UniProtKB/Swiss-Prot annotation:
GO cellular component, one term: ribosome
Keyword Transferase set for record: no
SUPFAM superfamilies: L9 N-domain-like, Ribosomal protein L9 C-domain
Cited function: Binds to the 23S rRNA.
Protein name: Large ribosomal subunit protein bL9
Gene Ontology MF, one: structural constituent of ribosome
Length: 202
């Protein structure tokens, strides 16, 4: 389907451009959200009549979006989730979760504005783009952790990837070292010393 864009659409075109897209994308997203018109002769004339107003509205919206982007840009959003010892989440963090976390921080955006290629399924950090306006973007960081303490460690750049096996091995090494230096521990040379003493008494 050929459409006339009423605003800039990422990876598609600028306001006023006539582009060809799949029918489903046009009907379910672009036309429904008022981002485009069908490229008919009637709508071409309609666009020419509303072009000046659209451009004025876009300039105003772009300025407001720039103010919002300044507040969002560089934010680190923390999402707490349960995960395995290896950092694999029991579930995932989706765009819906990120939008909710932003809202809790006083930032209201819609799901289509958050660009996430695939749900987040591991503990750690990921940078995302938030399209505040078709021509204004901001970058945020999403920190996924099992606790607030762990999130702070991740934000400081600490390595939290140590596996349980590694921690167990370290604990065993510490325990072995403690036993080695225990003054009450039985040592192999004690029986020999006792035998020498018995020999002297005889």
């Amino acid at each position: 389907m050929e459409i006339i864009l009423l605003e800039r659409v990422a990876k598609l075109g600028q306001m006023g451009e006539v582009v060809k897209v799949k029918d489903g994308f046009a009907r379910n997203f672009l036309l429904r959200r008022g981002k485009a018109l069908r490229a008919t002769a009637e709508n071409r004339a309609k666009y020419d009549g509303m072009k000046a107003e659209l451009e004025a509205n876009n300039i105003k919206a772009k300025g407001e979006a720039a103010t919002v982007a300044e507040k969002i840009n560089g934010r680190d959003i923390v999402v707490i989730r349960q995960a395995s010892e290896t950092g694999q989440l029991f579930g995932s963090v989706t765009v819906r979760d990120i939008v909710a976390a932003l809202a809790a921080d006083g930032i209201i955006v819609s799901r289509p504005q958050v660009w996430l290629d695939a749900p987040i399924k591991t503990i750690g950090q990921q940078k995302l783009t938030v399209a505040v306006h078709p021509e204004v973007e901001a970058e945020i960081t999403v920190t996924v952790a099992r606790s607030v303490d762990e999130a702070e460690r991740i934000q400081r750049g600490e390595d939290i990837s140590t596996r349980r096996e590694d921690r167990d091995a370290a604990a065993e090494a510490i325990a072995a070292a403690g036993e080695f230096f225990d003054p009450d521990a039985q040592h192999d040379d004690e029986p020999a010393a006792e035998d020498d003493q018995n020999a002297e008494e005889k």
